[in-house]
C-alpha cells in the first residue's frame, strides 16, 4: 500500500481511515508500518479483550504522540486490516497513557457505505452501552502489561474531533515542510 497516496480528507466532511484492527478480533494489537506498507503484530495483549470498534488511523496526519491520528470506526461488521474506509467524525474519546495524550476520534461510515448511520451525527446519538464498552476497553486493555496504563479523561464533541483532525493535518504538513 502506498500510504502517501491516501489523503486525510476524502472531502470537506469525510475522512479516510486505514483500518489496523478489526472490531471483535482477538487480543492482538496490529500496527501499520508507514515505511513498508505492511501490517505488523505490535504485541499480543495480555487481557482477553477485543476492540469494540474497528481501529485505525487517518493517513497524512500527525498527533501529539508522533503517530497518525487514531480513529475508532463504529460499524456493524469487522473491516479487514489495511482497508481504507470513508467516515464522518462524530466526537472524540479523550485519554492519556504512559506516553502522554492519546485521543481517539470516534467516526461512523459515510452514507455511501452504510445509510444506517445517517442518524448518528454526534456522540450523544450513539448507544450509551457502546460508549461504556469503549471506555471500559480502553481503561482495561493494558491492565496486565508492565509499565503501561491508560486514563480516560472524558469525551469531546464533533467540533473537538474536527479540530484535532485539522491539527493533525497541519502538524504533518509542518513536519514535511521543515
Curated annotation (Swiss-Prot):
<dbReference type="GO" id="GO:0000287">
    <property type="term" value="F:magnesium ion binding"/>
</dbReference>
<feature type="binding site">
    <location>
        <position position="102"/>
    </location>
    <ligand>
        <name>Mg(2+) 1</name>
    </ligand>
</feature>
<feature type="binding site">
    <location>
        <position position="141"/>
    </location>
    <ligand>
        <name>substrate</name>
    </ligand>
</feature>
<feature type="binding site">
    <location>
        <position position="70"/>
    </location>
    <ligand>
        <name>Mg(2+) 2</name>
    </ligand>
</feature>
<comment type="similarity">
    <text>Belongs to the PPase family.</text>
</comment>
<keyword id="KW-0479">Metal-binding</keyword>
<feature type="binding site">
    <location>
        <position position="65"/>
    </location>
    <ligand>
        <name>Mg(2+) 1</name>
    </ligand>
</feature>
<feature type="binding site">
    <location>
        <position position="70"/>
    </location>
    <ligand>
        <name>Mg(2+) 1</name>
    </ligand>
</feature>
<feature type="binding site">
    <location>
        <position position="29"/>
    </location>
    <ligand>
        <name>substrate</name>
    </ligand>
</feature>
<dbReference type="InterPro" id="IPR008162">
    <property type="entry name" value="Pyrophosphatase"/>
</dbReference>
<feature type="binding site">
    <location>
        <position position="43"/>
    </location>
    <ligand>
        <name>substrate</name>
    </ligand>
</feature>
<dbReference type="GO" id="GO:0006796">
    <property type="term" value="P:phosphate-containing compound metabolic process"/>
</dbReference>
<dbReference type="InterPro" id="IPR036649">
    <property type="entry name" value="Pyrophosphatase_sf"/>
</dbReference>
<protein>
    <recommendedName>
        <fullName>Inorganic pyrophosphatase</fullName>
        <ecNumber>3.6.1.1</ecNumber>
    </recommendedName>
</protein>
<keyword id="KW-0963">Cytoplasm</keyword>
<dbReference type="GO" id="GO:0005737">
    <property type="term" value="C:cytoplasm"/>
</dbReference>
<dbReference type="GO" id="GO:0004427">
    <property type="term" value="F:inorganic diphosphate phosphatase activity"/>
</dbReference>
<keyword id="KW-0378">Hydrolase</keyword>
<comment type="subunit">
    <text>Homohexamer.</text>
</comment>
<feature type="binding site">
    <location>
        <position position="55"/>
    </location>
    <ligand>
        <name>substrate</name>
    </ligand>
</feature>
<dbReference type="Pfam" id="PF00719">
    <property type="entry name" value="Pyrophosphatase"/>
</dbReference>
<keyword id="KW-0460">Magnesium</keyword>
<comment type="function">
    <text>Catalyzes the hydrolysis of inorganic pyrophosphate (PPi) forming two phosphate ions.</text>
</comment>
Amino acid at each position: 500500500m502506498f500510504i502517501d497516496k491516501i489523503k486525510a480528507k476524502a472531502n470537506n466532511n469525510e475522512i479516510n481511515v486505514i483500518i489496523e484492527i478489526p472490531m471483535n478480533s482477538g487480543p492482538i494489537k496490529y500496527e501499520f508500518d508507514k515505511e513498508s506498507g505492511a501490517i505488523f503484530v505490535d504485541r499480543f495483549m495480555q487481557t482477553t479483550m477485543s476492540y469494540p470498534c474497528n481501529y485505525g488511523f487517518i493517513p497524512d496526519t500527525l498527533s501529539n504522540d508522533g503517530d497518525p491520528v487514531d480513529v475508532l470506526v463504529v460499524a456493524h461488521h469487522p473491516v479487514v486490516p489495511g482497508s481504507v474506509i470513508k467516515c464522518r467524525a462524530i466526537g472524540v474519546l479523550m485519554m492519556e497513557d504512559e506516553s502522554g495524550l492519546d485521543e481517539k476520534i470516534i467516526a461512523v461510515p459515510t452514507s455511501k457505505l452504510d445509510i444506517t448511520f445517517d442518524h448518528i451525527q454526534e456522540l450523544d446519538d450513539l448507544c450509551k452501552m457502546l460508549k461504556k464498552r469503549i471506555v471500559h476497553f480502553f481503561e482495561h486493555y493494558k491492565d496486565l502489561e508492565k509499565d503501561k496504563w491508560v486514563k480516560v479523561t472524558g469525551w469531546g464533541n464533533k467540533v473537538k474531533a474536527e479540530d484535532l483532525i485539522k491539527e493533525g493535518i497541519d502538524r504533518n504538513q509542518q513536519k514535511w515542510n521543515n
